[in-house]
Amino acid sequence: MEPFIHLHVHTQYSLLDGQASIDALIDKASKDGMRAIAVTDHGVMFGIKEFFNKVNKKNSKPQGVIKDSEKALKPLLAKSDPTAEEQQQITELQEKIAEAKAAIFKPILGCECYCARHSRHSKLATQDDRSGWHLIVLAKNKNGYKNLIKMVSLSWTEGFYGRPRIDKELLEKYHEDLIVCSACLGGEIPQLILQGKQDKAEESVLWFKQLFGDDYYLEMQRHETHDPNADCTIYPHQVEVNKVLVELAHKH
């Protein structure tokens, strides 16, 4: 199996949506061989500090191994003509470092934002205006993290109407060092596809592509279930949307 990590994940901080604790998510991802996971709670970043701290604690052991091994390796590499025994030590230390680096787990900080259909300042008496399109936003680095928390803060102080909403004006202003994914069936592009508005969906793809370039991704989901208690209407819609997403991805 190709290396894989989850970039759209809700924790217990996504009220009435997520259920998994951050500890459980980190443990499950690690046991499944994943070297990273994103946390993208709905409209909030309440769990990010806990997530970051717990991953740092998990990484402390392999980081200690790397530090000690590199310290022991340095004088050996400085020798112009190491003995056979020293060469064996070098090889063993390098393997130890590589193994420890492979055990490092990466926390990806993000949020599933609600993006206003019009403006974050718009407060029309419609259900559409009270929610907003779903949009996955991930921080590439510290600057991206700062831009993300700025947008999320403004979604509460300026854009709250039913839900905390960002808008495309904020995306244009704070887009640097962010990765954006088109999200689930609640995203703008999937919704336009389901409404039969493929031209509008393509216009939206081009808007995001122009702003984020190679840091913009079309997200595909395929959640088939035969559980009689589950919502079995989701999967057929995902299949319908995925077909068009593949076409748009190949085209753009």
Task: Label each region the model flagged.
Residues M1-H252:
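Phosphodiester-processing cores and adjacent nucleic acid-binding clamps
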